[in-house]
């Protein structure tokens, strides 16, 4: 299913989140199970299914990484259940350095500045990846789709690192 069509949006990495939320509320009002309280069991079941579908679509389009994956799915490249590893050794080396930095924060004299520095570094790198990703997602070339998949994998790694940094920060300041 094309989630962009469901919300009457053009397929794009950049989505107007306010418009997305507005369309979500409209769709929810139209199919909410409460509207079908006096309907047949089949209509009630369909309403619940449609509501779940709308919720899934909204969560997917709201999240930039999932949105990028959905765009690739629409082009015939499925990433959601893959176990492919990254091939970019430079990125993997950088990731190892970041993980070492995460470990060192626990023993740092100035964890605040190291945490801020890592947040900035992660954000800057994710912005760079996103900049490279956007034109690949609109391309019709399969090679570009494969490269987009690699960029999405990197964004997933960055999101995990960001989560780890947040956990380290929470543990230090709790």
Curated annotation (Swiss-Prot):
GO terms for molecular function: ATPase activator activity; protein-folding chaperone binding. Pfam families: HSCB_C. CDD domains: DnaJ (cd06257). It comes from the Bacteria. Keywords: Chaperone. GO terms for biological process: [2Fe-2S] cluster assembly; protein complex oligomerization; protein folding. GO terms for cellular component: iron-sulfur cluster transfer complex. SMART domains: DnaJ. Residues 2-74 form the J domain. HAMAP family: HscB. Co-chaperone involved in the maturation of iron-sulfur cluster-containing proteins. Seems to help targeting proteins to be folded toward HscA. Belongs to the HscB family. Interacts with HscA and stimulates its ATPase activity. This is Co-chaperone protein HscB homolog. It comes from Shewanella halifaxensis (strain HAW-EB4).
